[in-house]
Protein backbone atom coordinates (compact mmCIF):
# COMPACT_ATOMS: atom_id res chain seq x y z
CA UNK A 1 0.00 0.00 0.00
CA UNK A 2 1.31 3.36 -0.98
CA UNK A 3 0.21 6.62 0.60
CA UNK A 4 0.68 9.99 -1.05
CA UNK A 5 2.30 12.49 1.27
CA UNK A 6 0.67 15.93 1.24
CA UNK A 7 3.24 18.44 0.11
CA UNK A 8 3.14 22.18 0.54
CA UNK A 9 5.05 24.99 -1.05
CA UNK A 10 5.38 26.45 2.44
CA UNK A 11 7.54 24.67 5.08
CA UNK A 12 6.08 24.01 8.49
CA UNK A 13 2.47 23.93 9.59
CA UNK A 14 2.06 27.47 10.88
CA UNK A 15 -0.19 29.97 9.11
CA UNK A 16 2.49 32.58 9.60
CA UNK A 17 4.92 30.57 7.52
CA UNK A 18 2.37 30.13 4.74
CA UNK A 19 1.47 33.79 4.78
CA UNK A 20 5.12 34.76 4.43
CA UNK A 21 5.30 32.83 1.13
CA UNK A 22 8.85 31.76 1.92
CA UNK A 23 10.88 28.63 1.37
CA UNK A 24 14.08 27.88 3.19
CA UNK A 25 17.22 29.42 1.81
CA UNK A 26 17.90 32.70 0.05
CA UNK A 27 17.58 31.15 -3.41
CA UNK A 28 14.07 29.97 -2.57
CA UNK A 29 13.00 33.43 -1.49
CA UNK A 30 14.32 34.92 -4.72
CA UNK A 31 12.44 32.29 -6.72
CA UNK A 32 9.16 33.02 -4.95
CA UNK A 33 9.55 36.78 -5.35
CA UNK A 34 10.18 36.26 -9.07
CA UNK A 35 7.10 34.05 -9.32
CA UNK A 36 4.92 36.62 -7.58
CA UNK A 37 6.18 39.35 -9.91
CA UNK A 38 5.46 37.21 -12.96
CA UNK A 39 1.95 36.39 -11.71
CA UNK A 40 1.22 40.07 -11.10
CA UNK A 41 2.41 40.86 -14.61
CA UNK A 42 0.18 38.12 -16.04
CA UNK A 43 -2.83 39.33 -14.07
CA UNK A 44 -2.27 42.91 -15.22
CA UNK A 45 -2.00 41.73 -18.83
CA UNK A 46 -5.27 39.81 -18.51
CA UNK A 47 -7.06 42.85 -17.14
CA UNK A 48 -5.95 45.33 -19.80
CA UNK A 49 -8.86 46.97 -21.51
CA UNK A 50 -9.42 46.04 -25.13
CA UNK A 51 -8.67 48.43 -27.96
CA UNK A 52 -11.88 48.87 -29.96
CA UNK A 53 -10.98 49.73 -33.54
CA UNK A 54 -13.86 51.03 -35.61
CA UNK A 55 -16.42 50.75 -32.78
CA UNK A 56 -18.48 53.93 -32.75
CA UNK A 57 -21.10 53.12 -30.11
CA UNK A 58 -20.04 54.38 -26.68
CA UNK A 59 -22.23 51.77 -24.97
CA UNK A 60 -20.57 48.90 -26.83
CA UNK A 61 -17.09 50.11 -25.86
CA UNK A 62 -17.99 50.34 -22.16
CA UNK A 63 -19.97 47.07 -22.09
CA UNK A 64 -17.11 45.17 -23.72
CA UNK A 65 -14.50 46.70 -21.40
CA UNK A 66 -12.88 48.71 -24.17
CA UNK A 67 -10.31 51.45 -23.63
CA UNK A 68 -12.14 54.79 -23.62
CA UNK A 69 -10.48 58.19 -23.74
CA UNK A 70 -12.74 60.18 -21.44
CA UNK A 71 -14.44 63.04 -23.32
CA UNK A 72 -17.46 63.31 -21.03
CA UNK A 73 -16.68 66.87 -19.91
CA UNK A 74 -17.92 67.86 -23.35
CA UNK A 75 -21.41 67.08 -22.02
CA UNK A 76 -20.97 69.59 -19.20
CA UNK A 77 -20.03 72.28 -21.71
CA UNK A 78 -23.11 71.52 -23.80
CA UNK A 79 -25.37 71.76 -20.76
CA UNK A 80 -23.87 75.10 -19.74
CA UNK A 81 -23.93 76.51 -23.27
CA UNK A 82 -26.70 78.89 -24.25
CA UNK A 83 -26.59 77.69 -27.85
CA UNK A 84 -29.70 75.84 -28.93
CA UNK A 85 -27.95 74.22 -31.89
CA UNK A 86 -24.21 73.48 -32.03
CA UNK A 87 -22.43 72.39 -35.21
CA UNK A 88 -19.03 70.73 -34.80
CA UNK A 89 -16.74 70.43 -37.82
CA UNK A 90 -13.70 68.19 -37.42
CA UNK A 91 -11.52 66.01 -39.68
CA UNK A 92 -12.64 62.48 -40.49
CA UNK A 93 -11.96 59.71 -37.97
CA UNK A 94 -11.78 62.16 -35.08
CA UNK A 95 -14.38 60.63 -32.77
CA UNK A 96 -17.39 62.65 -33.91
CA UNK A 97 -19.76 59.68 -34.10
CA UNK A 98 -18.48 58.22 -30.83
CA UNK A 99 -19.11 61.53 -29.09
CA UNK A 100 -22.63 61.66 -30.51
CA UNK A 101 -23.36 58.21 -29.09
CA UNK A 102 -21.86 59.29 -25.76
CA UNK A 103 -24.10 62.36 -25.68
CA UNK A 104 -27.12 60.25 -26.53
CA UNK A 105 -26.43 57.69 -23.79
CA UNK A 106 -26.03 60.43 -21.19
CA UNK A 107 -29.15 62.44 -21.94
CA UNK A 108 -31.58 59.83 -23.21
CA UNK A 109 -34.54 58.64 -21.19
CA UNK A 110 -34.44 55.45 -23.22
CA UNK A 111 -37.57 53.36 -23.61
CA UNK A 112 -37.73 50.06 -25.50
CA UNK A 113 -40.33 49.46 -28.20
CA UNK A 114 -42.26 47.47 -25.55
CA UNK A 115 -42.35 50.49 -23.25
CA UNK A 116 -39.68 49.31 -20.78
CA UNK A 117 -37.23 51.83 -19.34
CA UNK A 118 -33.51 51.26 -20.00
CA UNK A 119 -30.99 52.33 -17.36
CA UNK A 120 -27.74 53.51 -18.97
CA UNK A 121 -26.42 55.35 -15.93
CA UNK A 122 -23.77 52.71 -15.21
CA UNK A 123 -22.01 53.52 -18.49
CA UNK A 124 -20.60 56.70 -16.93
CA UNK A 125 -19.38 55.18 -13.66
CA UNK A 126 -15.88 56.46 -12.93
CA UNK A 127 -15.88 58.99 -15.78
CA UNK A 128 -15.18 62.69 -15.32
CA UNK A 129 -18.79 63.83 -15.81
CA UNK A 130 -19.79 62.08 -12.57
CA UNK A 131 -17.61 64.53 -10.62
CA UNK A 132 -19.41 67.62 -11.96
CA UNK A 133 -22.09 67.88 -9.29
CA UNK A 134 -25.83 67.45 -9.07
CA UNK A 135 -26.63 70.44 -11.27
CA UNK A 136 -25.04 68.65 -14.23
CA UNK A 137 -26.02 65.09 -13.30
CA UNK A 138 -29.66 66.12 -12.90
CA UNK A 139 -29.81 66.12 -16.72
CA UNK A 140 -28.75 62.48 -17.01
CA UNK A 141 -31.36 60.20 -18.62
CA UNK A 142 -33.96 62.96 -18.58
CA UNK A 143 -34.72 63.67 -22.25
CA UNK A 144 -36.06 61.90 -25.30
CA UNK A 145 -33.32 61.79 -27.95
CA UNK A 146 -33.67 61.72 -31.72
CA UNK A 147 -30.54 60.29 -33.35
CA UNK A 148 -29.93 60.47 -37.09
CA UNK A 149 -26.86 59.61 -39.16
CA UNK A 150 -26.78 60.70 -42.79
CA UNK A 151 -23.75 58.67 -43.90
CA UNK A 152 -25.86 56.08 -45.74
CA UNK A 153 -26.91 58.75 -48.26
CA UNK A 154 -23.64 58.44 -50.16
CA UNK A 155 -25.32 56.98 -53.26
CA UNK A 156 -24.98 57.39 -57.05
CA UNK A 157 -28.47 58.84 -57.65
CA UNK A 158 -30.80 61.17 -55.79
CA UNK A 159 -33.50 58.49 -55.67
CA UNK A 160 -31.16 56.04 -53.94
CA UNK A 161 -29.78 58.66 -51.55
CA UNK A 162 -33.29 59.85 -50.68
CA UNK A 163 -34.42 56.26 -50.09
CA UNK A 164 -31.52 55.73 -47.67
CA UNK A 165 -32.39 58.89 -45.73
CA UNK A 166 -36.04 57.85 -45.56
CA UNK A 167 -34.93 54.45 -44.24
CA UNK A 168 -32.91 56.14 -41.45
CA UNK A 169 -35.95 58.25 -40.54
CA UNK A 170 -38.17 55.15 -40.47
CA UNK A 171 -35.74 53.33 -38.16
CA UNK A 172 -35.79 56.21 -35.69
CA UNK A 173 -39.58 56.23 -35.69
CA UNK A 174 -39.56 52.48 -35.05
CA UNK A 175 -37.14 53.00 -32.16
CA UNK A 176 -39.62 55.38 -30.58
CA UNK A 177 -42.75 53.38 -31.42
CA UNK A 178 -43.51 53.10 -27.69
CA UNK A 179 -45.16 56.53 -27.95
CA UNK A 180 -48.09 54.79 -29.64
CA UNK A 181 -48.89 53.30 -26.22
CA UNK A 182 -49.51 56.80 -24.86
CA UNK A 183 -52.19 59.34 -25.62
CA UNK A 184 -52.18 60.41 -29.26
CA UNK A 185 -54.76 61.77 -31.65
CA UNK A 186 -55.95 59.44 -34.38
CA UNK A 187 -54.48 61.75 -37.03
CA UNK A 188 -51.02 61.77 -35.42
CA UNK A 189 -51.17 58.02 -34.88
CA UNK A 190 -51.83 57.47 -38.58
CA UNK A 191 -48.98 59.80 -39.60
CA UNK A 192 -46.59 58.10 -37.16
CA UNK A 193 -47.47 54.63 -38.44
CA UNK A 194 -47.15 55.70 -42.09
CA UNK A 195 -43.68 57.12 -41.52
CA UNK A 196 -42.45 54.15 -39.46
CA UNK A 197 -43.64 51.78 -42.21
CA UNK A 198 -41.97 53.80 -44.97
CA UNK A 199 -45.30 54.83 -46.47
CA UNK A 200 -45.16 58.54 -45.69
CA UNK A 201 -45.35 61.39 -48.17
CA UNK A 202 -42.39 63.57 -49.17
CA UNK A 203 -43.77 66.39 -47.03
CA UNK A 204 -44.14 64.08 -44.02
CA UNK A 205 -40.53 62.92 -44.31
CA UNK A 206 -39.28 66.50 -44.71
CA UNK A 207 -40.93 67.48 -41.41
CA UNK A 208 -40.50 64.09 -39.73
CA UNK A 209 -38.28 65.15 -36.84
CA UNK A 210 -40.36 68.15 -35.94
CA UNK A 211 -43.35 65.80 -35.78
CA UNK A 212 -41.45 63.12 -33.84
CA UNK A 213 -40.21 65.63 -31.26
CA UNK A 214 -43.82 66.70 -30.68
CA UNK A 215 -44.89 63.08 -30.15
CA UNK A 216 -41.99 62.52 -27.77
CA UNK A 217 -42.84 65.65 -25.79
CA UNK A 218 -46.41 64.48 -25.26
CA UNK A 219 -45.17 61.11 -23.99
CA UNK A 220 -42.14 62.17 -21.88
CA UNK A 221 -43.32 65.67 -20.98
CA UNK A 222 -39.81 66.82 -21.93
CA UNK A 223 -38.43 68.53 -25.02
CA UNK A 224 -36.25 66.44 -27.32
CA UNK A 225 -32.51 66.53 -27.94
CA UNK A 226 -31.78 66.05 -31.65
CA UNK A 227 -28.41 64.59 -32.69
CA UNK A 228 -27.42 64.61 -36.37
CA UNK A 229 -24.20 62.88 -37.41
CA UNK A 230 -22.33 63.25 -40.73
CA UNK A 231 -24.75 65.93 -41.90
CA UNK A 232 -22.47 66.91 -44.78
CA UNK A 233 -22.17 63.47 -46.42
CA UNK A 234 -25.32 63.62 -48.57
CA UNK A 235 -24.51 67.17 -49.69
CA UNK A 236 -20.88 66.51 -50.61
CA UNK A 237 -21.92 63.35 -52.45
CA UNK A 238 -24.74 65.16 -54.27
CA UNK A 239 -22.36 67.92 -55.33
CA UNK A 240 -20.15 65.45 -57.22
CA UNK A 241 -23.04 63.32 -58.49
CA UNK A 242 -24.96 66.21 -60.00
CA UNK A 243 -28.09 66.35 -57.83
CA UNK A 244 -27.03 68.93 -55.24
CA UNK A 245 -30.07 71.19 -55.70
CA UNK A 246 -32.54 68.35 -55.09
CA UNK A 247 -30.68 67.08 -52.05
CA UNK A 248 -30.19 70.45 -50.42
CA UNK A 249 -33.91 71.23 -50.74
CA UNK A 250 -34.76 68.11 -48.73
CA UNK A 251 -32.01 68.58 -46.12
CA UNK A 252 -32.96 72.24 -45.67
CA UNK A 253 -36.61 71.32 -45.07
CA UNK A 254 -35.66 68.56 -42.63
CA UNK A 255 -33.31 70.80 -40.66
CA UNK A 256 -35.41 73.95 -40.64
CA UNK A 257 -38.55 72.20 -39.41
CA UNK A 258 -36.62 70.36 -36.68
CA UNK A 259 -34.21 73.09 -35.58
CA UNK A 260 -35.64 76.48 -36.47
CA UNK A 261 -39.36 76.59 -35.78
CA UNK A 262 -39.64 73.67 -33.37
CA UNK A 263 -41.10 74.46 -29.92
CA UNK A 264 -40.31 70.91 -28.76
CA UNK A 265 -36.53 71.18 -29.21
CA UNK A 266 -34.30 71.25 -26.11
CA UNK A 267 -30.89 71.19 -27.83
CA UNK A 268 -29.29 69.87 -30.98
CA UNK A 269 -25.76 68.73 -31.77
CA UNK A 270 -24.68 68.34 -35.40
CA UNK A 271 -21.36 66.88 -36.56
CA UNK A 272 -19.56 66.69 -39.88
CA UNK A 273 -16.27 67.28 -41.67
CA UNK A 274 -17.27 70.20 -43.87
CA UNK A 275 -18.79 73.57 -43.09
CA UNK A 276 -21.79 73.93 -45.38
CA UNK A 277 -22.68 77.61 -45.66
CA UNK A 278 -25.36 78.82 -43.28
CA UNK A 279 -27.29 80.29 -46.20
CA UNK A 280 -27.58 76.83 -47.79
CA UNK A 281 -29.28 74.80 -45.06
CA UNK A 282 -29.42 76.93 -41.91
CA UNK A 283 -31.24 79.95 -43.32
CA UNK A 284 -32.73 82.03 -40.54
CA UNK A 285 -31.37 79.77 -37.81
CA UNK A 286 -30.21 82.45 -35.38
CA UNK A 287 -29.55 80.02 -32.53
CA UNK A 288 -26.77 78.16 -34.38
CA UNK A 289 -23.25 78.04 -32.93
CA UNK A 290 -20.47 76.73 -35.19
CA UNK A 291 -17.45 75.18 -33.46
CA UNK A 292 -14.52 74.57 -35.80
CA UNK A 293 -10.85 73.73 -35.22
CA UNK A 294 -10.21 77.46 -34.82
CA UNK A 295 -12.11 77.66 -31.53
CA UNK A 296 -10.84 76.58 -28.10
CA UNK A 297 -13.99 75.88 -26.09
CA UNK A 298 -14.30 72.29 -27.33
CA UNK A 299 -10.71 72.06 -28.55
CA UNK A 300 -9.94 68.95 -26.50
CA UNK A 301 -13.29 67.22 -27.12
CA UNK A 302 -12.30 65.66 -30.45
CA UNK A 303 -9.00 63.93 -31.15
CA UNK A 304 -6.47 63.06 -28.44
CA UNK A 305 -4.50 65.60 -26.43
CA UNK A 306 -0.84 64.90 -25.63
CA UNK A 307 -1.64 63.97 -22.03
CA UNK A 308 -4.29 61.51 -23.24
CA UNK A 309 -1.78 59.94 -25.63
CA UNK A 310 0.85 59.69 -22.88
CA UNK A 311 -1.68 58.04 -20.58
CA UNK A 312 -2.72 55.52 -23.23
CA UNK A 313 0.86 54.63 -24.14
CA UNK A 314 1.75 54.15 -20.47
CA UNK A 315 -1.31 51.95 -19.94
CA UNK A 316 -0.08 49.56 -22.64
CA UNK A 317 3.58 49.89 -21.53
CA UNK A 318 4.52 51.81 -24.66
CA UNK A 319 5.55 55.09 -23.00
CA UNK A 320 9.01 54.95 -24.57
CA UNK A 321 7.41 55.25 -28.01
CA UNK A 322 6.10 58.79 -27.39
CA UNK A 323 8.79 60.52 -29.52
CA UNK A 324 7.94 58.31 -32.50
CA UNK A 325 4.20 58.78 -31.96
CA UNK A 326 4.64 62.54 -31.71
CA UNK A 327 6.70 62.62 -34.88
CA UNK A 328 4.10 60.67 -36.86
CA UNK A 329 0.69 61.61 -35.48
CA UNK A 330 0.93 65.00 -33.73
CA UNK A 331 -0.31 66.85 -36.79
CA UNK A 332 -2.95 69.26 -35.51
CA UNK A 333 -3.11 72.51 -33.62
CA UNK A 334 -6.71 73.36 -32.73
CA UNK A 335 -6.18 77.03 -31.93
CA UNK A 336 -3.57 76.61 -29.18
CA UNK A 337 -4.18 72.93 -28.31
CA UNK A 338 -1.95 70.18 -29.73
CA UNK A 339 -4.13 67.34 -30.99
CA UNK A 340 -3.16 63.86 -32.15
CA UNK A 341 -5.02 61.88 -34.79
CA UNK A 342 -7.07 59.37 -32.73
CA UNK A 343 -7.55 56.85 -35.53
CA UNK A 344 -3.79 56.58 -36.01
CA UNK A 345 -3.07 56.40 -32.27
CA UNK A 346 -5.60 53.62 -31.68
CA UNK A 347 -4.30 51.56 -34.59
CA UNK A 348 -0.68 52.16 -33.60
CA UNK A 349 -1.24 51.03 -30.01
CA UNK A 350 -3.27 48.02 -31.17
CA UNK A 351 -0.52 46.88 -33.55
CA UNK A 352 2.32 47.51 -31.12
CA UNK A 353 0.53 45.90 -28.17
CA UNK A 354 0.00 42.74 -30.23
CA UNK A 355 3.45 42.99 -31.80
CA UNK A 356 1.93 43.09 -35.29
CA UNK A 357 4.48 45.69 -36.32
CA UNK A 358 7.48 47.45 -34.80
CA UNK A 359 7.06 50.62 -36.81
CA UNK A 360 4.65 53.53 -37.12
CA UNK A 361 2.41 53.38 -40.18
CA UNK A 362 0.21 55.93 -42.05
CA UNK A 363 -3.09 54.48 -40.82
CA UNK A 364 -5.19 57.54 -41.70
CA UNK A 365 -4.11 58.15 -45.29
CA UNK A 366 -6.56 55.82 -47.04
CA UNK A 367 -9.63 56.30 -44.84
CA UNK A 368 -11.43 58.68 -47.22
CA UNK A 369 -11.21 60.86 -50.30
CA UNK A 370 -10.08 64.47 -50.58
CA UNK A 371 -11.78 64.96 -53.93
CA UNK A 372 -13.69 68.05 -52.89
CA UNK A 373 -10.45 69.78 -51.85
CA UNK A 374 -8.76 68.86 -55.12
CA UNK A 375 -11.66 70.26 -57.11
CA UNK A 376 -11.80 73.49 -55.11
CA UNK A 377 -8.06 74.01 -55.52
CA UNK A 378 -8.34 73.33 -59.23
CA UNK A 379 -11.06 75.95 -59.61
CA UNK A 380 -9.39 78.53 -57.36
CA UNK A 381 -8.42 81.92 -58.76
CA UNK A 382 -4.92 83.39 -58.47
CA UNK A 383 -5.67 85.16 -55.18
CA UNK A 384 -6.89 81.94 -53.55
CA UNK A 385 -3.87 80.03 -54.84
CA UNK A 386 -1.56 82.68 -53.41
CA UNK A 387 -3.27 82.26 -50.04
CA UNK A 388 -2.80 78.49 -50.25
CA UNK A 389 0.88 78.92 -51.02
CA UNK A 390 1.23 81.17 -47.98
CA UNK A 391 -0.37 78.51 -45.78
CA UNK A 392 1.83 75.74 -47.21
CA UNK A 393 4.90 77.83 -46.40
CA UNK A 394 3.83 78.16 -42.78
CA UNK A 395 2.24 81.59 -43.00
CA UNK A 396 -1.17 82.75 -41.87
Question: Residue spans of the language-model regions?
Answer:
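Phosphate-binding site recognition
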Residues: 35-396
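Short, small-residue-biased leader/transition segments that mark boundaries at the very start
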Residues: 25-32
